[in-house]
């Protein structure tokens, strides 16, 4: 069994004082660790979704890799203003972050989805993504992150790396 924490670096007081940033880049750089992480993440999901929904931007990496390995398509949740709204159907949700606020958007559709992101911190992004998927017509069957930094003790997010628990 691989210890994924060996592939995570910490940066203290980034992006602002009091925040400990967990850098997943070393894991992504190692083909064995990355492929094992994708395998283990996918094995946490009992039923294959219609789509893996990646949250901008590193969620795109994991959603794409999971779709390639386990099947299904990829949908993207983008930061506001990054998607064209040519047919005026774009949906958006605003929410608070650990160190600010943001708005995310996606195109509507249907099907079962697993929402995927790299890091789970306060839960704000994942909760907003779930609301956004549901209001856009999707059925959220699961939520998945590579890493839980341990701020929110109780949640229903599946992860393979946990800190603070």
Task: Walk through the language-model features, giving the residues of each.
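Active-site-facing substrate-recognition patch
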Residues: 1-48
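Short, glycine/charge-rich flexible loops or terminal/linker lids adjacent to PRPP-binding catalytic cores
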Residues: 72-114
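Short loop/helix-cap segments at secondary-structure boundaries that form the rim of catalytic
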Residues: 68, 85-87, 151-156
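PRPP-dependent phosphoribosyltransferase catalytic core
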Residues: 6-7, 127-165
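Acidic, divalent-metal-coordinating active-site segment for phosphoryl/phosphodiester hydrolysis
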Residues: 117-130
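Conserved acidic residues
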Residues: 50, 111, 141
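Short Gly/Thr/Asp-enriched flexible loops that form oxyanion-binding sites at enzyme active sites
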Residues: 61-70, 129-130
């Amino acid at each position: 069994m691989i210890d994924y924490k060996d592939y995570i670096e910490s940066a203290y007081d980034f992006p602002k004082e009091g925040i400990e940033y967990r850098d997943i880049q070393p894991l992504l750089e190692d083909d064995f660790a990355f492929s094992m992480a994708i395998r283990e993440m996918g094995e946490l999901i009992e039923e294959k979704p219609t789509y893996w929904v990646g949250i901008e931007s590193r969620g795109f990496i994991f959603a794409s890799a999971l779709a390639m390995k386990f099947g299904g398509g990829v949908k993207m949740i983008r930061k506001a203003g990054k998607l064209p709204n040519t047919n005026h159907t774009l949906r958006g949700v605003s929410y608070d972050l650990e160190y600010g606020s943001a708005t995310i958007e996606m195109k509507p559709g249907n099907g079962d989805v697993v929402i995927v992101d790299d890091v789970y911190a306060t839960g704000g992004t994942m909760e907003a993504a779930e609301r956004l998927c549901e209001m856009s017509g999707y059925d959220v069957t699961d939520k998945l992150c590579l890493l839980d930094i341990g701020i929110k003790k109780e949640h229903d997010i599946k992860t393979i790396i946990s800190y603070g628990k």
